[in-house]
């Protein structure tokens, strides 16, 4: 077992009941273009077109053969674009249940699949987009070969669902998905799970099972990759989450794409925090209807630490999101707040009384201060368990020194890996966008 000692389990109120309930009816779904790093879409549909579930909506111009398919049947009601015509979202009003079917195999055939058969089915169905590379966190090229593949079957994000609860309903599909992934390449398939979980394993020649324990970010794929098979500019690995493995298993045994999602609907502003069954790309206004406390709320697709605000053309459940988190908008100002004892405030430092409390806090979107320079007081080192020097790395990201940042290990990271650094930063800096800018520059210029 790999035990993580550094990190932070955020003491946030609104933890979900670990029982799956049916969510509100899904009337509208969407694919969010900006989730796919570096993707340039070639549209295959127009507004007003009627599409089937599994039908191609757009293809990546930079990566021919990588298609993005409809998560439900219905009518394309909007294709939202932003500045410079960047694709924001393709919205579908859910109608009917027509769908496109793909190649189906029986369970005995799964262990005999060739890599080409696996690639063809994943790419034609759009499920290839469940895979992401490290470094750069992009959808892999159609002919790329990884050093290894990581399956994340644990989650230490605040307010997250327990994967074991979800997997109990789909164990056969999950093992089928692992079997399919083991046939995708000859390298290792790493299954990472919590040390105290009862997730059974399957006997596959190239499957390695790893147990992790400790505070967040022990459950992030970036942490797993760092300790098991670190990447470099010349070495790439792929990773995906456990619910996408279930979907892959169902695709190969039924010939149909599976877009159901079990997500945690939780946070201080949720009336009844729990796990709900919904659909990939679901409209979050519909999903949270009559579920939230009164007032101005911020709905987040994903974790409170690294998720995206669900608003306007982005008001949908993200492709990789397994959570819907809701906090209050913190717009009120506190006079001389820095001098008060702060028994109802949380800090990783011993500057407020809340640091010594075991209570859960009603966090809001307020950052409790204005932007200022980095202050190296050891806060970053407390929450980063990786074998890197976080203060120096963050300094290089802030200054745009990509050569030094690369030498210090930025290629191993994704935005979610620096989310805790953003949370504890005394200077209120957002390190995720800085990291993405550095990765884009490194990929472009080398």
Curated annotation (Swiss-Prot):
Keywords: Ion transport, NAD, Sodium, Sodium transport, Translocase, Transport, Ubiquinone
InterPro entries in alphabetical order: NqrA (IPR008703), NQRA_2nd (IPR056148), NqrA_C_domain (IPR022615), NQRA_N (IPR056147)
GO annotation terms (biological process): sodium ion transport
Keyword Transport recorded: yes
Record-listed E.C. numbers: 7.2.1.1
Enzymatic reactions: a ubiquinone + n Na(+)(in) + NADH + H(+) = a ubiquinol + n Na(+)(out) + NAD(+)
GO molecular function: oxidoreductase activity, acting on NAD(P)H, quinone or similar compound as acceptor
Transmembrane segments: none
The keyword GTP-binding belongs to this UniProt entry's keyword annotation: no
Subunit structure: Composed of six subunits; NqrA, NqrB, NqrC, NqrD, NqrE and NqrF.
PANTHER family: NA(+)-TRANSLOCATING NADH-QUINONE REDUCTASE SUBUNIT A
Role, per record: NQR complex catalyzes the reduction of ubiquinone-1 to ubiquinol by two successive reactions, coupled with the transport of Na(+) ions from the cytoplasm to the periplasm. NqrA to NqrE are probably involved in the second step, the conversion of ubisemiquinone to ubiquinol.
Family under the similarity heading: Belongs to the NqrA family.
Protein name as catalogued: Na(+)-translocating NADH-quinone reductase subunit A
Source species of the chain: Histophilus somni (strain 129Pt) (Haemophilus somnus)
């Amino acid at each position: 077992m790999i035990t993580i000692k550094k990190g932070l389990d955020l003491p946030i109120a609104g933890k979900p009941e670990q029982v799956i309930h049916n969510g509100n009816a899904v009337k509208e779904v969407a694919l969010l273009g900006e989730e796919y790093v570096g993707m340039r879409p070639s549209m295959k549909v127009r507004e007003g077109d009627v599409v089937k579930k599994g039908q191609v909506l757009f293809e990546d111009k930079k990566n021919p053969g990588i298609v993005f398919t409809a998560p439900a049947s219905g009518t394309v009601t909007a294709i939202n674009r932003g500045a410079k015509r960047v694709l924001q979202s393709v919205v579908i009003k859910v109608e009917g249940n027509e769908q496109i079917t793909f190649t189906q195999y029986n369970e005995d055939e799964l262990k005999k699949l060739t890599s080409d058969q696996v690639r063809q089915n994943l790419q034609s169905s759009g499920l290839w987009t469940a895979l992401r590379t490290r470094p750069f966190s992009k959808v892999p090229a159609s002919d790329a070969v990884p050093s290894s593949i990581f399956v994340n079957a644990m989650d230490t994000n605040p307010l997250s669902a327990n994967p074991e609860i979800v997997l109990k309903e789909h164990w056969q599909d999950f093992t089928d998905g692992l079997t399919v992934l083991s046939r995708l390449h000859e390298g290792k398939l790493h299954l990472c799970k919590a040390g105290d979980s009862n997730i059974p394993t399957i006997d596959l020649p190239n499957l390695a099972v790893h147990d992790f324990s400790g505070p967040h970010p022990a459950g992030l794929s970036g942490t797993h990759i760092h300790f098991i098979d670190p990447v470099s500019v010349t070495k790439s690995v792929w990773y995906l989450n456990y619910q996408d493995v279930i979907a892959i298993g169902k695709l190969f045994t039924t010939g149909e794409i599976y877009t159901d999602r079990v997500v945690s609907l939780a946070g201080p502003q949720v009336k009844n925090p729990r796990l709900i069954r919904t659909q990939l790309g679901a409209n979050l206004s519909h999903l949270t209807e009559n579920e939230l406390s009164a007032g101005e709320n911020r709905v987040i697709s994903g974790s409170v630490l690294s998720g995206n605000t669900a608003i306007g053309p982005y008001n949908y459940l993200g492709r990789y999101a397994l959570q819907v988190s809701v906090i209050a908008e913190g717009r009120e100002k506190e006079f001389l707040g820095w001098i008060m004892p702060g028994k109802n405030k949380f800090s990783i430092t011993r500057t407020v009384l809340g640091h010594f409390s075991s209570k859960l806090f009603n966090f809001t979107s307020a950052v409790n201060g204005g932007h200022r320079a980095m202050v190296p007081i050891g806060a970053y080192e407390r929450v980063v368990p990786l074998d890197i020097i976080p203060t120096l790395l963050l300094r290089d990201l802030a200054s745009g020194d990509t050569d030094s940042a690369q030498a210090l290990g930025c290629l191993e990271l994704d935005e979610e890996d620096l989310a805790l650094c953003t949370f504890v930063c005394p200077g209120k800096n957002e390190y995720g966008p800085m990291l993405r800018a550095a990765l884009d520059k490194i990929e472009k210029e080398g």
